[in-house]
Amino acid sequence: MYDVTIVMTIGKVFRFQTDEESKPNEYQFRHENNQLFWIPVGDDGIYLNPMHIVSAEFRVINKQNN
């Protein structure tokens, strides 16, 4: 699971959590190939242009087994 923070050039910050293990790799691929990157926002989601992203952090959240 990842705690994701994306900062845009206009100062807008998006924070969300995802359990998709491929999300960091997908972000890197889309950034390198200048393709839109989908993120969840509210009940739906939006596409971000990687040229407008200042930084993206994917921090691993350790799951605790009960």
Model-assigned labels for residue ranges:
Residues 1-3, 36, 45:
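A generic structural signal for beta-strand entry/edge sites
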Residues 29-43:
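Acidic, aromatic-enriched beta-alpha/helix-loop junctions
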Residues 39-66:
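Short, mixed-charge low-complexity intrinsically disordered segments
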Residues 1-32:
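N-terminal acidic leader/helix
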